Structure formats: C-alpha cells, structure tokens
Amino acid sequence: MSTVIAALQQAIHRYHIQHPDDDFPLLHHREQTLHRRFQALFFAPLLGIETLTAFDTREHPLLTLIGQGYHSSTLGQFLGQLERINAAEALMPALVPHQPGQVTYVDGHMIAFWTRVAMHKGKITMLGRIMAGSQALIAHNAVGQALFVEYHPPDRHLSQVIVAYCQKVVEATGIMLFVIDRAVNSLALACAFAQQGWGLLCMLDDNEHAGLASFDATLVDTHTDGTRVYSGSWTVPRHEDPRHFVIVAPAAGKLLVYWGTAKVRDLLEVSAWPQVYRERSEIQENSFKRMIDHGALNTNYGRKKILGVDRHQQRAQEQLDHALEAAQKRVAKQEKAVTTQQAKVIESTSKGHGKRLEQRQRTLGGLEKAYKDVQHKHDQLAAAAAALGPLGERADRDFRKQTIMTVRTLLLENALTSFMAVLLGFLKTPVSLDCLLTLLFERSGARLETATQVVYWVNTTGLSVSYHRLLAAVADGLCAMDLREQGKPLHVRLKTMPP
C-alpha cells in the first residue's frame, strides 16, 4: 500500500505543478487521509460493497478495519478527484512486481453497461447480448499477477488494438513474449509481432489445416497416454509466414495446432508450448471469475460519456461504398456487353442472317436480363446508402474512473494471491481463497489495540465443528505469519459472541 500512496502523492504533486491555479481537496490531503480513503476503496469488495452507494446502506466493519468510516459522498468525491489527476496512469506501475517474469498472458473481459443513450455496442460474452459496454484488456504474468489494464469500446475487436496494447505492456514490464487466445490468430498479426521482435503464442483454427498432412512435422515427444507432440512448418512452404507450429495429436480426439513466432522458439522449448498455452485458463479466465466474485470487476464506475462519430454507421457506410463501387463496375461491364451484342444483332439483321441472328438475339436477351439484375442490385445499394443519411453521433464511455477502480481490483487480487501463497505455507489444512474470505469477512468481530499489539476477534457463533476447526487453523496461521499493523504485532483470536 505504501507504493500506491507514494504513486498518488507523486501524481498530486505533478498535477499541482502543471495546474498551479487549480484547487480542490485532494491536493491538500495528508498522507493519512489519502491512505485511509484509498483503503476504503481497496477493501470495499471484500466487504460485499461493489457500488459506492452501498457504503450508505450496508453494515460494514470499515471503522474497525481501518479506523475510519466513510459514506458514498466522500468516496465519490475522492474518486472524482483521482480521475481529475489521472490517477490510473500513476497507479499502473504499482501492479508490476520486481521480477515480472518472461511470459505475459493477455485477454479481454467485456462488461455490460445499461443506458438509454445511443452508444457503440459489442457482444457482451457473459450475457450473450449485443449491447453497450466496455472491454478491459488485462495482462497477467506466468504466476497470475496482474500487470496492466486498458479499456476500449466494445465494438473494437482485439486484433485492432493488440499491437499498440502490447507495446505499452513491453514498456511497462520489459516482457516480450505474449500468450493470447485465437482472437489474434492471423498471419498479419504474426508478422506484426515478428517485426517488433516479440513472441506471440496462439492457436490455429481447425479450418486452417487439413490435419497432420498439412505440416512438415517432426515427432518431439510422446506422452504416457499416447498423445504425440510434433514440431514443424507448412508442408508447402509459405515464405511470408513467420510462424512455427507445434501439433498435438491425442490418441483419441481432434488435432490441436499451436503456433509461435521466432521469439517464442528462442525462449520456450517447443514441447512446453501446449502447457504454457493451457495455463491461460487458470491464470486469466478463472482469475476473471474470482475478481467478479470478490473484486467487483463487473461493476461500472463513472457515467461520463464522450460523443464521437457513429462508428457503426461509418462502417456500414464504408461497406456500402465498397459494394456500390463494385456494383458500378459490374453495371458498366454488363452495359458494355449489351451494347456490343446489340451491334452484333444489328449486323446480323442487316446481313440477313438466320440461325446466327437467333443465336445473337438469344444471347442479347440473357445479357439484358443480367444487366437488369446488376442494375437492380446497384439501385438497392444506392437506396441503402441514401437511407443511412449524414454521419451521426454515438457515445463512448469515459473510462478514467473505471480504469482507476479496475486497477484497484487488480491490486487487491495481486495482494490476495501473494497473501494466500504465504498463508498456505503455514497451514496443514488446504483452504480456498473463497472459503477464507467467507470465514473472515462475512462474520462479525471486534478489534482491540493496546500499546503493544493489535488483536482481531472473530465471532465463531453458528460455525460447524469442521469450519470452526478450519478457522482456528487459519487464525494460528495468521499469527505465525508475524503480521504487523503500524509496527505492532497482529493477532487473530476466536470468540463465541452472543447474538
């Protein structure tokens, strides 16, 4: 947390220098005030608080936890002022650990946004609906630590923004090897990553190959279950294709084809590619589910919108313009063919041809029908283009508050991941993060601070014998971790409290 507060103080100082005439409360916050208010935002999801207004109606132990209670008006103002100083940019480096690793996993997460305003739309995967929303691109390292986040409108496909996004990740972390799902499976992106000197590990679609025969492959490994792993390139060389392939042929089931650029071959053994790719599920997809459950990842923050050109209409207009241009060429071609054939019919008529005249008239009839068809199609496209009218406007979300709160969520997830890794080293009984959060944050308790220690009492009323035993083991583990609060040793005790 000290790193976060230091980053915020630097952002405040920088803003004050750049805008010496501006004056609002955040610019004058003491370190303690800044620390407590950010802590309130940080711990809110663990207390079951997703939207800030829930601070006004939900009973929560914030006063016990950080020594100060807050309502939504105060925290809403605080968040608005963090937005004003562009705190998201300042907080982003706090996500990156000292040793970020050598592999970055990137995935997008769609969040629905309900509004009556005309906004750009995309497919919100978890709801299966086309609607307004936002797309968070989140990067994790190989141990599941979140590294970077950036928001985009939902109508922009991942492939359109991924190169610029990865450039920012490289600048922030120094990692140049990326593992991304089939949303970026294309030769163009493989070439783009290869030109940058980056590694990209992805999968080939099933319709892009005809099985093992499509590849000049060499057997590199055979698993105990009969699965064979091959490595190679296309059977028919494609000199413009920089991809190398790893093919997994299970004893039963379909072929799986992974591909990577030269950087991937330099950094990873080809036999390890399938396992590295499969770890996406736990590192990212399951992480998103956890952050939805206890990190408020799906909660929208901020109502500001930015008006701009209607990209849906713009794309439709561009498609119609291309189709209309092609239709005009077809009309001109058919018109020329009809004119040429009419001249032949006139020639046959003047020369008194019999059978040839019938043939040419029959051909002319077919050409005239084809001309009418292409002219009709052209008229339809022209009418559709005219119906679109002048280019309109649609709104996009202002993502500044959303980004700040998502960085908060990622910081929380990183802290919980590190905390669990340490705690499990002191426990003989395995426990999941969800179970631990339920035991500690969904039960009442008390906090006692003396001159020499801080004691947290957890209410055990209503716990079954097995869960009481588990909570006791967790309490012992927490005490063994030698945690400290403001320099004082922290102890966790269990106590049955009256209802």
PLM features: what roles do these ranges have?
Residues 151, 195-287, 292, 452-453, ...:
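An anionic, glycine-rich sequence signature occurring as long contiguous blocks
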Residues 22-29, 263, 269-278, 299-308, ...:
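Short, solvent-exposed helix-loop connector elements
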Residues 1-130, 136-153, 159-164, 171, ...:
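Dynamic "connector" segments at or just before major functional cores
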Residues 169-177:
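Short, surface-exposed connector motifs at secondary-structure boundaries
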Residues 115-117, 186-193, 211-215:
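A short acidic (Asp/Glu
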Residues 334-385:
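Extended alpha-helical coiled-coil "stalk/arm" regions
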Residues 179-188, 206-209:
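Acidic, metal-coordinating catalytic cores used for nucleic-acid/nucleotide bond scission
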Residues 288-349:
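Charged, amphipathic alpha-helical linkers/stalks
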